[in-house]
């Protein structure tokens, strides 16, 4: 038994599917203590959009530490905090015509979500938060209440209240108008659904299976929430910071949410940091009404600001992300077309959040396991883990993209058999389905 097995809780997940000991990482490559190399198409579940140990950020961080720059500051004023706020305003908000106050709720995405829901309830005086089928918003109890995943919800140990799930875009299939259903519930006094305080939505459901909301659906949702006086919260924890192309995942739709949550890659270097962006008229907090010990980690301010300057002062990263995403989509479409018809593989995604849906979680997991054996990291997502998901760093090179696609193609062929054969009768090992 290793020290990990001896000391760590049974709750650990990723290490079960990737049973190696990592030691170093650079860009989109990770290396084990034994020197084995792995191509990373996981990127810390979206926390490493700029890759591991990004050279443009690393030296700034090292220099800051060596000069004894402030590390922990709660919400005290610091030079690092000022620089981040000014850079975020100049590089992100002003060019997009967005007017948000910035709240630092704590170190992680669930902190940002909790703050958003608390504020929606505070300003409206209502209780319920509406979320969508297959949503994932975090592991704290409030965030779990608006999460669809039964395994995650079960970890709470008691019923989760004050939340209502409605169908996400495409959930009912075909041409079904899921927002018409939602609005019918709101308009019908006999539906049993009260007007909610807020609606929380992911424009692309990452953990839910790379389910993509169309721009038209998002615009209809924005219109619906405006007409009913409901606070619209966009959870951009995983899909923000350029994952879908634009800095915010909602940019393509043209909507302006009332509240936006950011975390994961907002710190630039993989350091913990979260933001809750809110329209000024919603900033009705009393001083200290929501706080947290680790809401002022200056090294994350430092690398977060530098990442904004390096990658968001022009449109180069966005264009590169969209181009690489289209290349992945092209190959995934070929893989789906090459598979036996009964497999009915479905390709999903936007930008560099891409996936292939398989008929079962066993198959999707087996593909991820085969890729790991070939030296590549990727995971499954969705109900039952049926979607093979890739979230490579936005800075991944074209050569690394092609290497990863070749591994995926070979892994799918290994698991499904040749393009003309039915799935082999051999038992496929059940994978561990993990989530961030």
Question: What spans do the regions from the language model cover?
Answer:
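Conserved N-terminal phosphate-binding loop of PLP-dependent enzymes in the Aspartate aminotransferase
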Residues: 1-436
């Amino acid at each position: 038994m290793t020290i990990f097995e001896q000391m760590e809780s049974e709750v650990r997940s990723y290490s079960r599917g990737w049973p190696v000991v990592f030691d170093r990482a650079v860009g989109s490559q990770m290396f084990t203590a034994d020197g084995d190399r792995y191509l990373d198409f996981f990127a810390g579940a979206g926390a490493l959009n700029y890759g591991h140990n990004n050279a443009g950020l690393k030296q700034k961080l090292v220099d800051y530490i060596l000069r004894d720059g402030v590390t922990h500051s709660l919400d005290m004023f610091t030079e690092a905090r000022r620089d981040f706020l000014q850079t975020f305003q100049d590089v992100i908000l002003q060019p997009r015509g967005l007017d948000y106050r910035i709240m630092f709720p704590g170190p992680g995405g669930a902190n940002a979500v909790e703050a958003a829901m608390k504020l929606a309830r505070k300003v409206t005086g209502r209780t319920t938060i509406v979320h969508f089928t297959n949503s994932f918003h975090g592991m704290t109890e409030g965030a779990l209440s608006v999460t669809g995943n039964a395994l995650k919800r079960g970890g709470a140990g008691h019923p989760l209240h004050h939340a209502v799930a409605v169908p996400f875009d495409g959930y009912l299939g075909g041409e079904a108008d899921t927002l018409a259903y939602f609005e019918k519930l709101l308009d019908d006094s006999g539906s049993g659904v009260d007007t909610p305080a807020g609606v929380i939505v992911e424009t692309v459901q990452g953990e839910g299976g790379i389910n993509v909301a169309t721009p038209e659906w998002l615009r209809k949702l924005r219109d619906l929430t405006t007409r009913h006086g409901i606070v619209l919260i966009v959870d951009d924890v995983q899909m923000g910071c350029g994952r879908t192309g634009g800095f915010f995942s909602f940019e393509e739709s043209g909507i302006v949410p009332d509240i936006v949550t950011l975390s994961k890659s907002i710190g630039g270097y993989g350091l913990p940091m979260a933001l809750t962006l809110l329209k000024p008229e919603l900033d009705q907090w009393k001083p200290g009404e929501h706080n947290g010990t680790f809401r002022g980690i200056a090294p994350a301010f430092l690398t977060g600001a530098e990442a904004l300057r390096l990658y968001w002062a022009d449109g180069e990263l966005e264009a590169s992300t969209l181009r690489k995403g289209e290349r992945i989509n092209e190959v995934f479409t070929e893989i789906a077309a090459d598979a036996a018809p009964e497999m009915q593989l479905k390709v999903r995604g936007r930008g560099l959040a891409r996936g292939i849906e398989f008929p079962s979680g066993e198959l999707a997991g087996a593909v991820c396991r085969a890729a790991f054996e070939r030296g590549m990291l990727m995971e499954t997502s969705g109900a039952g883990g049926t979607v093979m998901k890739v979230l490579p760093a936005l800075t991944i090179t074209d050569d690394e993209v092609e290497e990863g696609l070749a591994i995926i193609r070979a892994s799918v062929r290994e698991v499904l058999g040749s393009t003309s054969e039915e799935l082999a009768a051999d038992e496929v090992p059940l994978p561990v389905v993990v989530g961030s």
